[in-house]
């Protein structure tokens, strides 16, 4: 230290070499460089491709609550649609579902347009089955087509059923386990069900176009004059056919019933009858609805247990076939 308290030049030089505290600007620059390095690191990582099963942008999962309040009860996160469909196919395969051969499908479904996507068939129901063994006639089997869309699923040509509905979720859970859903068992009255699945998860639900031709005859209307057609997708040639030219006179003052008739060509007719109508009236209705069967020898049998309706003079009530499914079999 020199006189007057002034520092020697050597001491001033040492004092000026001390590090100064970082300023706010220095901190901002450091943070900016750190952020740029992190972004470069992320961009250098290879992008993982979206699985082939996810064909639409991923949507956030729906959140459901089983309690009365949002913060009360069990919290359930519903997976996106693609995950639902993929897991359904995966678990169905694990429970014995097999790919449906296109040749087999086309030979079995003459009235269905050929589908080029994947499909799986599930086996028998989880119920205890009867010891009755069906023969080779495949008409004993009831075919149901399950179409899985982006926004829900449909059965045959039915309406869209959202995945978020608890009843629909229970239906799909049964399919996942390789079981025939209870809903289908009740529908077919114990007949064997073959369930086919089609993957349409890259499409929104498409409502099938049904074509009806009204009855053009004359007469006094007592009830339903035209049959209800449960249609399957058909070719343009088949759509041009007239299948609604039969009339069944219904007495609404008497008990009525609905009979579903599965024809030998795979199509179905549903018609309302009085319980006093006879088996012969059902046969006559089939022939008048589908004239191509007028010269064909066929029989009518119940679906389950299989029994031929030999006495066609008995009433529907006496034959115990009210609100049931009967099958047409060619001789």
From Swiss-Prot:
<dbReference type="InterPro" id="IPR036241">
    <property type="entry name" value="NSFL1C_SEP_dom_sf"/>
</dbReference>
<feature type="modified residue" description="Phosphothreonine">
    <location>
        <position position="59"/>
    </location>
</feature>
<feature type="modified residue" description="Phosphoserine">
    <location>
        <position position="56"/>
    </location>
</feature>
<dbReference type="GO" id="GO:0005794">
    <property type="term" value="C:Golgi apparatus"/>
</dbReference>
<comment type="subunit">
    <text>Interacts with VCP. Does not bind ubiquitin.</text>
</comment>
<dbReference type="Pfam" id="PF08059">
    <property type="entry name" value="SEP"/>
</dbReference>
<dbReference type="GO" id="GO:0000132">
    <property type="term" value="P:establishment of mitotic spindle orientation"/>
</dbReference>
<dbReference type="InterPro" id="IPR001012">
    <property type="entry name" value="UBX_dom"/>
</dbReference>
<keyword id="KW-0539">Nucleus</keyword>
<feature type="domain" description="UBX">
    <location>
        <begin position="252"/>
        <end position="329"/>
    </location>
</feature>
<feature type="compositionally biased region" description="Basic and acidic residues">
    <location>
        <begin position="37"/>
        <end position="48"/>
    </location>
</feature>
<keyword id="KW-0007">Acetylation</keyword>
<dbReference type="GO" id="GO:0031616">
    <property type="term" value="C:spindle pole centrosome"/>
</dbReference>
<dbReference type="InterPro" id="IPR029071">
    <property type="entry name" value="Ubiquitin-like_domsf"/>
</dbReference>
<feature type="modified residue" description="Phosphoserine">
    <location>
        <position position="235"/>
    </location>
</feature>
<dbReference type="GO" id="GO:0005783">
    <property type="term" value="C:endoplasmic reticulum"/>
</dbReference>
<dbReference type="GO" id="GO:0005634">
    <property type="term" value="C:nucleus"/>
</dbReference>
<keyword id="KW-0256">Endoplasmic reticulum</keyword>
<feature type="compositionally biased region" description="Basic and acidic residues">
    <location>
        <begin position="1"/>
        <end position="16"/>
    </location>
</feature>
<dbReference type="GO" id="GO:1904780">
    <property type="term" value="P:negative regulation of protein localization to centrosome"/>
</dbReference>
<dbReference type="GO" id="GO:0005829">
    <property type="term" value="C:cytosol"/>
</dbReference>
<keyword id="KW-0206">Cytoskeleton</keyword>
<dbReference type="GO" id="GO:0046604">
    <property type="term" value="P:positive regulation of mitotic centrosome separation"/>
</dbReference>
<feature type="modified residue" description="N-acetylalanine">
    <location>
        <position position="2"/>
    </location>
</feature>
<feature type="modified residue" description="Phosphoserine">
    <location>
        <position position="231"/>
    </location>
</feature>
<protein>
    <recommendedName>
        <fullName>UBX domain-containing protein 2B</fullName>
    </recommendedName>
</protein>
<keyword id="KW-0597">Phosphoprotein</keyword>
<dbReference type="InterPro" id="IPR012989">
    <property type="entry name" value="SEP_domain"/>
</dbReference>
<feature type="modified residue" description="Phosphoserine">
    <location>
        <position position="234"/>
    </location>
</feature>
<dbReference type="Pfam" id="PF00789">
    <property type="entry name" value="UBX"/>
</dbReference>
<comment type="similarity">
    <text>Belongs to the NSFL1C family.</text>
</comment>
<feature type="region of interest" description="Disordered">
    <location>
        <begin position="1"/>
        <end position="70"/>
    </location>
</feature>
<keyword id="KW-0333">Golgi apparatus</keyword>
<feature type="modified residue" description="Phosphoserine">
    <location>
        <position position="66"/>
    </location>
</feature>
<feature type="domain" description="SEP">
    <location>
        <begin position="141"/>
        <end position="206"/>
    </location>
</feature>
<keyword id="KW-0963">Cytoplasm</keyword>
<comment type="function">
    <text>Adapter protein required for Golgi and endoplasmic reticulum biogenesis. Involved in Golgi and endoplasmic reticulum maintenance during interphase and in their reassembly at the end of mitosis. The complex formed with VCP has membrane fusion activity; membrane fusion activity requires USO1-GOLGA2 tethering and BET1L. VCPIP1 is also required, but not its deubiquitinating activity. Together with NSFL1C/p47, regulates the centrosomal levels of kinase AURKA/Aurora A during mitotic progression by promoting AURKA removal from centrosomes in prophase.</text>
</comment>
């Amino acid at each position: 230290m020199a006189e007057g308290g002034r520092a020697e030049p050597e001491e001033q030089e040492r004092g000026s070499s001390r590090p100064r505290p970082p300023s706010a600007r220095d901190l901002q620059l450091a943070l900016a460089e750190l952020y740029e390095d992190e972004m470069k690191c992320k961009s250098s990582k290879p992008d993982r491709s979206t699985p082939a099963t996810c064909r639409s942008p991923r949507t956030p999962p729906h959140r459901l609550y089983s309690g009365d309040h949002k913060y009360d009860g069990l919290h359930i996160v519903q997976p996106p649609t693609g995950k639902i469909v993929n897991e359904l196919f995966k678990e169905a395969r694990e429970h014995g579902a097999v790919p449906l051969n296109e040749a087999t499908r086309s030979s079995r479904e003459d009235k269905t347009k050929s589908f080029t996507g994947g499909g799986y068939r599930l086996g028998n129901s989880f119920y205890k089955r009867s010891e009755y063994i069906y023969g080779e006639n495949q008409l004993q089997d009831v075919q149901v087509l399950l179409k899985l869309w982006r926004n829900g699923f449909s059965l045959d040509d039915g309406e869209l059923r959202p995945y978020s509905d608890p009843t629909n979720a229970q239906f799909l859970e049964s399919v996942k386990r390789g079981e025939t859903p209870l809903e289908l068992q009740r529908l077919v009255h114990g007949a064997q069900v073959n369930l086919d699945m089609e993957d349409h998860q890259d499409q929104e639900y498409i409502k099938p176009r049904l074509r009806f031709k009204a009855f053009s005859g004359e007469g006094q209307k007592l009830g339903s004059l035209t049959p209800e057609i449960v249609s399957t997708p058909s070719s343009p040639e088949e759509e041009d056919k007239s299948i609604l030219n039969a009339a069944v006179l219904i007495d609404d003052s008497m008990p009525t019933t609905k009979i579903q008739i599965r024809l030998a060509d795979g199509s179905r007719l549903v018609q309302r009858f009085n319980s006093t109508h006879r088996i012969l009236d059902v046969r006559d209705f089939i022939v008048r609805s589908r004239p191509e069967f007028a010269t064909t020898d066929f029989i009518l049998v119940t679906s389950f247990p299989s029994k031929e309706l030999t006495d066609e003079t008995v009433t529907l009530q006496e034959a115990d076939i009210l609100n049931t499914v009967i099958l047409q079999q060619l001789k």
